[in-house]
Amino acid sequence: MKKSSLLYKIINGIWDMCYIWKTEMRNVFRDEGVLIFCILVPLGYPLLYSWIYNNEVVREVDTAIVDLSHSHSSREFIRDYDASPDAKATYYCNSLDEAKELVRRQAVHGILYFPADFDTKLNRGEQAHVGVYCDMSLMLTYKAIYQTSQAVASHINSGIQITQAGGFTDRDDEITTEPLAFDEVPIFNTTGGYGNAILPAVLVLILQQTMLLGIGMAAGTSRELNRNRELIPVSEHYGGIFRIVFGKALVYFMVYAVMGMYLTLVVPKLFSFVSMVTWTTILGFLLPYILSCVFFGLMLSCLVRYRENVMLLVVFTSVPLLFMTGVSWPLSNIPGFWQGFSWVFPSTFGIRGFLRISSMGDSLSDILPEFRALWIQTGVYFLATCLVFRQQLRSARLKADLTAEVAEEEDEAEEIVDS
């Protein structure tokens, strides 16, 4: 077969791509750092994170009580508060400073404060206040204390309304306290817990972040092992852009196709999270998401000079990226600039799409904006990766030529000296 024929070039390109794939795959399993980020972390970290929040809600949160009123009304409030499943009146303090000290020592996670005029204002028909102080270092305890206080206050308010209304029948009392009856039925997050709300987003983010860490660490290793500190080695197999890009991308796509199915199908089932995912939908959704993450990581790998650099580039972005998706913070309250900035990352559309698939049972046709955005990112980052690797290949060849010229000059100088 002639070397100039198209068929020969195609076969040779496929052969070189397979060689690059084999080399990169071998490096993934031989490099302990890459193996940890690409295999062990995606396997183990979701289990640990899901196990920690598997209870969904916290119960019997310790609370300090500062009752300066010492009245029947304040004791009724405290009794109802303590009877709730989510909170518990643990300590009774004589002052607010004493209660703050308990919070500082983490003996309690919140304070209920009743001023001295609490019962007096209620008897006068005036508005009375109950101070609720919460430790916001953990949102679950804050939620338990705050919502329990609100529920007890609403219950006591209903009793005050009934007394002041002076109704004659139970129906009059119902209309007074609840003129519009409604039933609160959670549709998607049926448990109302932290796990079902946040963990699906975290699982998708783990795919992107561990992939970026693994690709970046592998790139740093390649530079450190290269004599010229270049990302791409000078070899006959690394003679074309597409064979390099496809060979490297195929490695991470194969690894993370398995990890993606594990994170989106196996982990939610293990911990009984709400999951309405179907095989066909998640396969179609993971294809553009994983591809966009792979090409995004390969594009950024040119910035990594040393293995440790990738930790500085990737790790600190996890929490901001989660916020910018609109999962843990309302999207309407995120400034337009940061919303636009979040579109750079595949995790933004990946998390939004997966949450709708998992919690609402949406199909691909229902999440077309996110699905199209992921394919657009795949195309854009693929082209950007090709441009970056083209520049890296040119730089590697140039430095190799310069090194060869210097070596030849040194050999000639040695021959002249010897003669």
List the predicted regions and their residue ranges:
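Extracytoplasmic/periplasmic domains immediately adjacent to an N-terminal transmembrane anchor
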Residues: 1-196, 391, 397-419
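Alpha-helical membrane-protein architecture signal
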Residues: 14, 18-22, 196, 237-238, ...
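Loop-to-transmembrane-helix entry motif
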Residues: 28-35, 206, 247-253, 257, ...
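Hydrophobic core positions of alpha-helical segments in small-molecule transporters
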Residues: 37-38, 200, 246-247, 310-313, ...
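Hydrophobic alpha-helical transmembrane segments of multi-pass membrane transport proteins
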Residues: 44-47, 185-268
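Membrane-spanning alpha-helical segments of multipass transporters and channels
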Residues: 48-49, 91, 101, 254, ...
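Hydrophobic alpha-helical segments typical of transmembrane helices
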Residues: 73-77, 148, 215, 295, ...
